[in-house]
Amino acid sequence: MHHPGRDQERLYLQVSDEFGGALERLARAYERDSDVRRDLLQEIHVALWRSLARFDGRCSMRTWVYRVAHNIATSRVIRAKKSATAFAELALLESIPDKTDGEAQLDRRRTLDRVYELIHELRPIDRQIILLYLEDLDTPAIAEITGLTARNVATKIHRIKQLLARQFHDKGC
């Protein structure tokens, strides 16, 4: 006997296990406040659960998960926009030192925090693109998720990297 609910639950558990870390990083990049971040992550998981019943395999599961997560996060940003905060036009960090001693770990943590702050200042579409890029999605996959052309995505990635690197160095990071 076929049980769609069990299949959906099994699929959700698999997706949650495989992409949970990426979803947490995405939520962290969108929300600074830990309570708001937890709410966003929960909202993403609920949306994923609901959406899996409609998943038809026309795209990869990875693309589906990122599309759902980014749509939820972007919608939330738009809804939560209360002030006319100026978003940075574009911005990337080329490398983060990978040291093992305690002081180096603290420096790395501070560097990552600063990178997340810079990413958070980006316009939602630019933030979405760079986060997908940092999750190692290729240009065609990012284009499919965002609805932009692959060429436009490639151009934006290049500009975002330049902007982030410039801001990172200009602000003494």
Regions found by a protein language model. Name each.
Residues 2-25, 35-38:
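A short, charge-rich alpha-helical start-of-domain segment used by transcription regulators
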Residues 20, 24, 45, 123, ...:
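C-terminal flanking helix
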Residues 39-46, 50, 59-71:
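Structural recognition of an alpha-helix C-terminal capping motif at a helix-to-coil junction
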Residues 56, 67-88, 104-108:
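Arg/Lys-rich amphipathic alpha helix in sigma70-family domain 2
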Residues 70, 140-170:
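DNA-recognition helix of helix-turn-helix
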Residues 98-130, 135-140, 144:
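Amphipathic alpha-helical segment used for protein-protein interaction
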